[in-house]
């Protein structure tokens, strides 16, 4: 990414990049928050791996660990959890029809999992998943992984 920038920006980006970390990775890898036991709550939740978290940042296990922290949820894996939902960056704007097909496939996998909630760590994916589920009148909720984790904290 930074190779496409003018040198004056490239140096700043390369200096900042190692200091940036996803909140899921921060909580699990740096602050060492982890589930004490596998949660087996009543509400089934599945996890969608966003492209930027899994491919660019290597974040995959950490969001699942945070979901498992909430005893109200039971994490169930969907097929192709790591497959793009069709909303990466400006892709949905430049390839709208293909984006819809990809989103529909992701929606089908969410429904097939039997989950009542689909979690992801990406706001763009949240919008795409919400749109695909709403188009089909599906009752599945879309939540950010940190929202599910926050629900488990004492109030």
PLM ranges: what are they?
Residues 1-155:
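Iron-sulfur cluster-binding electron-transfer modules in prokaryotic oxidoreductases
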């Amino acid at each position: 990414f930074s190779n496409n920038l003018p040198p004056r920006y490239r140096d700043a980006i390369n200096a900042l990049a190692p200091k940036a970390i996803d909140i899921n990775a921060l909580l699990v890898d740096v602050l060492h928050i982890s589930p004490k036991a596998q949660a087996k709550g009543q509400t089934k939740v599945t996890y969608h791996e966003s492209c930027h978290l899994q491919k660019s940042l290597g974040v995959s296990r950490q969001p699942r660990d945070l979901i498992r922290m909430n005893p109200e949820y039971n994490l169930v894996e969907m097929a192709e959890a790591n497959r793009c939902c069709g909303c990466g960056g400006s892709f949905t704007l430049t390839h709208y029809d293909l984006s819809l097909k990809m989103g529909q496939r992701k929606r089908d996998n969410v429904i097939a999992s039997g989950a009542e909630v689909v979690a992801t760590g990406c706001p763009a994916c949240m919008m795409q998943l919400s749109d695909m589920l709403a188009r089909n009148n599906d009752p599945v909720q879309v939540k950010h992984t940190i929202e599910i984790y926050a629900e488990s904290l004492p109030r």
